């Protein structure tokens, strides 16, 4: 079952989610719109196991990284960003 990993622009570039991911789904890429000049990216979502460790590691009040398991979407979960 495939999972969707979304990175939102509230990412502060701290790398916590990247370090927490056991399957290396996430990586940091250059991005000029935050203080750290980098943002998380999810180029390998097919490797996501749905553990949500990246979500747990995110220090922002509004989770910058979200994992949607299988058929979950922002709409089905009642979330709109």
Swiss-Prot record:
Its cofactor is [4Fe-4S] cluster. GO terms for cellular component: chloroplast thylakoid; photosystem I; plastid thylakoid membrane. Residues 2-31, 39-68 form the 4Fe-4S ferredoxin-type domain. Its main location: plastid. GO terms for biological process: photosynthetic electron transport in photosystem I. It catalyses: reduced [plastocyanin] + hnu + oxidized [2Fe-2S]-[ferredoxin] = oxidized [plastocyanin] + reduced [2Fe-2S]-[ferredoxin]. The keyword Chloroplast does not apply. It is a peripheral membrane protein. GO terms for molecular function: 4 iron, 4 sulfur cluster binding; electron transfer activity; metal ion binding; oxidoreductase activity. [4Fe-4S] cluster 1 binds at residues 11, 14, 17, 58. It comes from the Eukaryota. It is found in: Plastid thylakoid membrane. [4Fe-4S] cluster 2 binds at residues 21, 48, 51, 54. This is Photosystem I iron-sulfur center. The gene is psaC.
């Amino acid at each position: 079952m495939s999972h969707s990993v979304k990175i939102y622009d509230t990412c502060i570039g701290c790398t916590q989610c990247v370090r927490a991911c056991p399957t290396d789904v996430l990586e940091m890429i250059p991005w000029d719109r935050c203080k750290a000049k980098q943002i998380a990216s999810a180029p390998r979502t097919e490797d996501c196991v749905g553990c949500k460790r990246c979500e747990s590691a995110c220090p922002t009040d509004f989770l910058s990284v979200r994992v949607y398991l299988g058929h979950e979407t922002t709409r089905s979960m009642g979330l709109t960003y």
